[in-house]
């Protein structure tokens, strides 16, 4: 059935962007790692510089999740063609710091067993994130200003977005938390998670253009998000809030992407 929200997820007769898998060096992690990069229609021929949106997956996902399950390329193609979103580059990272790439992939082309539990929420992803930005800004035609960078993620990726954006308060003017986990795991000793209140004060003191929080009414992280919003409210920090029906599901995360992307780089 045509019409409505589902049209944004379809391959329509509009100009299509390009999706590429790229390997980059992460000196912080001592690894060659893989990212997925969406460039908008016309990137190859325009000569223009573009803003960049870093889009992060949740627990159990990798750099393929937002393309395969999130319909990111279709959503961006359609929003850009409709004039609702600015043409932008979207960079999808792998938040499992022990992995080079999605299971079964390696920089040597060898199949690697995915046995160990990857490092996920202990500071490695956050501390190594500048390596990704350095690669993108060295290899793509991009605007290299805070006002031209956005970061958002779902669940664990929302957690990473929260902590990366407060750790590097001059990096992102647009932050999106989709069904985000909020607090680090008990016993986590990474300096990334220390002095959270002071870091938030610095971040919000620099007045990000958009700090957007979205969650479903029956999401198991709902209460965590209520508590986090109370902290922001108590300190007078400005954010926008979007509440949907339903829980911790891709149906919601796709909706959040369609709401968030049009607000970027305005």
Model segments located where?
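Non-catalytic cap/lid and distal C-terminal segments of serine-dependent acyl enzymes
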Residues: 1-266
């Amino acid at each position: 059935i045509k019409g409505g929200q589902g049209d944004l997820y379809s391959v329509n007769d509009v100009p299509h962007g390009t999706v590429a898998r790229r390997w980059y060096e992460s000196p912080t992690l001592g690894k060659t790692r893989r990212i997925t990069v969406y460039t908008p229609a016309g990137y190859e021929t325009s000569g223009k510089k573009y803003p960049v949106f870093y889009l992060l997956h949740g627990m159990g996902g990798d750099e393929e999740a937002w393309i395969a399950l999130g319909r990111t390329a279709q959503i961006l193609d359609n929003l850009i063609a409709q004039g609702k979103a600015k043409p932008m580059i979207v960079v999808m990272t792998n938040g499992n710091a022990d992995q080079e790439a999605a299971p079964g992939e390696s920089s040597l082309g060898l199949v690697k067993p995915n046995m160990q539990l990857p490092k996920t929420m202990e500071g490695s992803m956050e501390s190594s994130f500048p390596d990704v930005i350095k690669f993108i800004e060295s290899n793509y035609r991009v605007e290299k200003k805070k006002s031209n960078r956005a970061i958002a993620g779902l669940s664990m990726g929302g957690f990473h977005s929260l902590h990366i954006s407060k750790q590097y308060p001059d990096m992102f003017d647009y932050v999106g938390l989709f069904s985000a986990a909020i607090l680090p795991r008990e016993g986590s000793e990474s300096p990334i998670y220390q002095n959270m209140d002071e870091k938030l004060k610095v971040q919000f003191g620099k007045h990000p253009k958009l700090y957007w929080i979205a969650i479903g009414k029956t999401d198991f992280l709902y209460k965590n998000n209520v508590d986090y919003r109370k902290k922001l409210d108590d300190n007078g920090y400005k954010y926008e809030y979007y509440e949907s029906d339903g829980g911790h599901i891709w149906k919601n995360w796709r909706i959040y992407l369609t709401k968030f992307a049009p607000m970027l780089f305005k």
